[in-house]
Amino acid sequence: MCWRPLCRLWSYLVYVQAVPCQIFQDDTKTLIKTIVTRINDISHTSVSAKQRVTGLDFIPGLHPILSLSKMDQTLAVYQQVLTSLPSQNVLQIANDLENLRDLLHLLAFSKSCSLPQTSGLQKPESLDGVLEASLYSTEVVALSRLQGSLQDILQQLDISPEC
């Protein structure tokens, strides 16, 4: 029996499957870089992503190893925080986060993963109080931590994260 044609077919199928995954991964990286540029364009004093600010503990910090699911959950929290801010500066970034989460879902799907829906997350109870007390600090801390998280996600995408 001749296996050579089957081997060629298999290598072709592997290549065809890898292309969409790579396209989604490249698009995701490009959007992350765009969001980081938008954050840099907003002139705020830089705050360390590791710095603790009272009342803002619900805003995710840095996570060294992220799965696609954890990336999506983290971005969902940031999206929720940014959409709660009245600042016009963060509207486009919040929209970009929604698009980024959609790309992560496509990337997960292309890897035969399914990400849980996180669109119905509960709003952190302390968010309204913090926003009322200090809008500016919340925006600065959220954007600073988001930027750090996006850099982590970018690095994780280079090593092909798990589901």
UniProtKB/Swiss-Prot annotation:
<dbReference type="GO" id="GO:2000196">
    <property type="term" value="P:positive regulation of female gonad development"/>
</dbReference>
<feature type="signal peptide">
    <location>
        <begin position="1"/>
        <end position="18"/>
    </location>
</feature>
<dbReference type="GO" id="GO:2000866">
    <property type="term" value="P:positive regulation of estradiol secretion"/>
</dbReference>
<dbReference type="GO" id="GO:0005179">
    <property type="term" value="F:hormone activity"/>
</dbReference>
<dbReference type="GO" id="GO:0006112">
    <property type="term" value="P:energy reserve metabolic process"/>
</dbReference>
<dbReference type="GO" id="GO:0032735">
    <property type="term" value="P:positive regulation of interleukin-12 production"/>
</dbReference>
<dbReference type="GO" id="GO:0006629">
    <property type="term" value="P:lipid metabolic process"/>
</dbReference>
<protein>
    <recommendedName>
        <fullName>Leptin</fullName>
    </recommendedName>
</protein>
<dbReference type="GO" id="GO:2000872">
    <property type="term" value="P:positive regulation of progesterone secretion"/>
</dbReference>
<keyword id="KW-0550">Obesity</keyword>
<feature type="disulfide bond">
    <location>
        <begin position="113"/>
        <end position="163"/>
    </location>
</feature>
<dbReference type="GO" id="GO:0001552">
    <property type="term" value="P:ovarian follicle atresia"/>
</dbReference>
<keyword id="KW-0964">Secreted</keyword>
<dbReference type="GO" id="GO:0046427">
    <property type="term" value="P:positive regulation of receptor signaling pathway via JAK-STAT"/>
</dbReference>
<keyword id="KW-0732">Signal</keyword>
<dbReference type="GO" id="GO:0010629">
    <property type="term" value="P:negative regulation of gene expression"/>
</dbReference>
<dbReference type="GO" id="GO:0006909">
    <property type="term" value="P:phagocytosis"/>
</dbReference>
<dbReference type="InterPro" id="IPR000065">
    <property type="entry name" value="Leptin"/>
</dbReference>
<dbReference type="GO" id="GO:0051428">
    <property type="term" value="F:peptide hormone receptor binding"/>
</dbReference>
<dbReference type="Pfam" id="PF02024">
    <property type="entry name" value="Leptin"/>
</dbReference>
<dbReference type="GO" id="GO:0032760">
    <property type="term" value="P:positive regulation of tumor necrosis factor production"/>
</dbReference>
<dbReference type="GO" id="GO:0032755">
    <property type="term" value="P:positive regulation of interleukin-6 production"/>
</dbReference>
<keyword id="KW-1015">Disulfide bond</keyword>
<comment type="similarity">
    <text>Belongs to the leptin family.</text>
</comment>
<dbReference type="GO" id="GO:0032868">
    <property type="term" value="P:response to insulin"/>
</dbReference>
<dbReference type="GO" id="GO:1900745">
    <property type="term" value="P:positive regulation of p38MAPK cascade"/>
</dbReference>
<dbReference type="GO" id="GO:0038108">
    <property type="term" value="P:negative regulation of appetite by leptin-mediated signaling pathway"/>
</dbReference>
<dbReference type="GO" id="GO:0044320">
    <property type="term" value="P:cellular response to leptin stimulus"/>
</dbReference>
<dbReference type="InterPro" id="IPR009079">
    <property type="entry name" value="4_helix_cytokine-like_core"/>
</dbReference>
<dbReference type="GO" id="GO:0043066">
    <property type="term" value="P:negative regulation of apoptotic process"/>
</dbReference>
<dbReference type="GO" id="GO:0005615">
    <property type="term" value="C:extracellular space"/>
</dbReference>
<comment type="function">
    <text>Key player in the regulation of energy balance and body weight control. Once released into the circulation, has central and peripheral effects by binding LEPR, found in many tissues, which results in the activation of several major signaling pathways.</text>
</comment>
<dbReference type="GO" id="GO:0032099">
    <property type="term" value="P:negative regulation of appetite"/>
</dbReference>
<dbReference type="GO" id="GO:0051897">
    <property type="term" value="P:positive regulation of phosphatidylinositol 3-kinase/protein kinase B signal transduction"/>
</dbReference>
<dbReference type="GO" id="GO:0033686">
    <property type="term" value="P:positive regulation of luteinizing hormone secretion"/>
</dbReference>
<dbReference type="GO" id="GO:0032008">
    <property type="term" value="P:positive regulation of TOR signaling"/>
</dbReference>
